[in-house]
C-alpha cells in the first residue's frame, strides 16, 4: 500500500482549511470532495483534477466540520457561528439550519444508514443526535463530569467534546474530549458503556474500522494514534511517528490502513498489520487539519483516493493503492 500525489491546489480557500469529507457517488455523478474553511465557505471539488464545482456560502464565521449523508444527496457544515447548515449537494438549497449555543458545534457524522446526525457538543460535554427526517433533536448523550467540582476546578471544562464517530453498524457512538478520554455509547439505549483511556491530551479525531465494528482509532495532541477495542475497553496498541499533534485520522475503505494529518505539517500512511507508519507525505507547509479517504462505489471509479487540507489554504489529492 502506498500514496502518490495526484494534484494540489494552492490557495484553494482564502483562509485556513479545517475540514474535508467526501460526498458519496450517486447515480448521476461521481463522488465529490467537500472542503470547509475559516473563510466561511464550503467548496465542492471534482476529482481527479480538483476542478471547483461550486462555492457555498451561508455561515457568518469559519467552517469547523463537515459531514456527508450516505445517500450522497445532502451534506452538513458546522461553523463557529454555532449553526449547522444542512444543504442539498447538487443545488446548495438549504434543507435545515440547526442552532446550538456558542462553542457547541465541533465534530459531526451521519449515522451509517443516514437516519441520525451526531454533533459533538463542545462545552456542554455531550453529543446531540438530530433526526434527519424531521431535523428535530431526539437525544442528548451526556458525558459524566467529575463529582462536585470546586469553582476553581478546571476539570469540567476539560470534558469539552471535540470529535465523534459512528461504528459501521450504527450501534455504537464514540466521542473524544479535551481531557484525552473517549466515551463509547450504546445509541439504542442512550447509555454510556465505558470510557477508553490511553491519551492524556485532547482527542481531536476518531474513526471506526470499516471492517471491524469493535476497532476504534483515535488521534490526539499527545502525538499518538491509538487502536482500541471499543467493546472490550482494551487498548490494542499505540502508534507514534508524528512530531506534534495528530489532528485527523481516517481509515481506508479496505480496512488495511489509516491516514493521519498532523500539526507537524505531514500526512502519514500507517500499515495496520505492521502497526507502523510506512509513508510520509509533505505536500503542506502548515498544519494538516483533515484527511479523508474516498468511500468505495460509483461508476468508473479508479483506484483509491485520499484528500488532505491545511492551514496553508491548500487542498491535496493522493492516489491510494
Swiss-Prot record:
GO terms for cellular component: Cdc73/Paf1 complex; Cul4-RING E3 ubiquitin ligase complex; cytosol; nucleus; plasma membrane. Keywords: Cytoplasm, Flowering, Nucleus, Repeat, Transcription, Transcription regulation, WD repeat. PROSITE patterns: WD_REPEATS_1, WD_REPEATS_2, WD_REPEATS_REGION. InterPro entries: G-protein_beta_WD-40_rep, SKI8, WD40/YVTN_repeat-like_dom_sf, WD40_repeat_CS, WD40_repeat_dom_sf, WD40_rpt. CDD domains: WD40. One of its GO terms (biological process) is negative regulation of flower development. Component of the nuclear PAF1 complex (PAF1C), which consists of VIP2/ELF7/PAF1, VIP3/SKI8/WDR61, VIP4/LEO1, VIP5/RTF1, VIP6/ELF8/CTR9 and CDC73. Component of the cytoplasmic SKI complex, which consists of SKI2, SKI3 and VIP3/SKI8. Interacts with VIP4 and VIP6. This is WD repeat-containing protein VIP3. It comes from Arabidopsis thaliana (Mouse-ear cress). The gene is VIP3.
Amino acid at each position: 500500500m502506498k500514496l502518490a500525489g495526484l494534484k494540489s491546489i494552492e490557495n484553494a480557500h482564502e483562509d485556513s482549511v479545517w475540514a474535508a469529507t467526501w460526498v458519496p457517488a450517486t447515480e448521476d455523478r461521481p463522488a465529490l470532495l467537500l472542503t470547509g474553511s475559516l473563510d466561511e465557505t464550503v467548496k465542492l471539488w471534482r476529482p481527479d483534477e480538483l476542478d471547483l464545482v461550486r462555492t457555498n456560502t451561508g455561515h457568518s464565521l469559519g467552517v469547523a466540520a463537515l459531514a456527508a449523508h450516505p445517500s450522497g444527496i445532502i451534506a452538513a457544515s458546522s461553523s463557529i457561528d454555532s449553526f449547522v447548515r444542512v444543504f442539498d449537494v447538487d443545488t446548495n438549497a438549504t434543507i435545515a439550519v440547526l442552532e446550538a449555543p456558542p462553542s457547541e458545534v465541533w465534530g459531526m457524522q451521519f449515522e451509517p444508514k443516514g437516519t441520525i446526525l451526531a454533533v459533538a457538543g463542545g462545552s456542554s460535554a455531550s453529543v446531540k443526535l438530530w433526526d434527519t427526517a424531521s431535523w428535530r433533536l431526539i437525544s442528548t448523550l451526556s458525558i459524566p463530569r467529575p463529582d462536585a467540582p470546586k469553582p476553581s476546578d478546571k476539570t469540567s471544562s476539560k470534558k469539552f467534546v471535540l470529535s465523534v464517530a459512528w461504528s459501521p453498524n450504527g450501534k455504537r457512538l464514540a466521542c473524544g474530549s479535551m481531557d484525552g478520554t473517549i466515551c463509547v455509547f450504546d445509541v439504542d439505549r442512550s447509555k454510556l458503556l465505558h470510557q477508553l483511556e490511553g491519551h492524556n491530551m485532547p482527542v481531536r479525531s476518531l474513526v471506526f474500522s470499516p471492517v471491524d465494528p469493535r476497532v476504534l482509532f483515535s488521534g490526539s495532541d499527545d502525538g499518538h494514534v491509538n487502536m482500541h477495542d471499543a467493546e472490550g475497553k482494551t487498548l490494542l496498541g499505540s502508534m507514534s511517528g508524528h512530531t506534534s499533534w495528530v489532528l485527523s485520522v481516517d481509515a481506508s475503505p479496505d480496512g488495511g490502513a489509516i491516514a493521519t494529518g498532523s500539526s507537524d505539517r505531514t500526512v502519514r500512511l500507517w500499515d495496520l498489520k505492521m502497526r507502523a507508519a510506512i509513508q510520509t507525505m509533505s505536500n503542506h507547509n502548515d498544519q494538516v487539519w483533515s484527511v479523508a479517504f474516498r468511500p468505495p462505489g460509483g461508476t468508473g471509479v479508479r483506484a483509491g483516493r485520499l484528500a488532505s487540507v491545511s492551514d496553508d489554504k491548500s487542498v491535496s489529492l493522493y492516489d491510494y493503492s
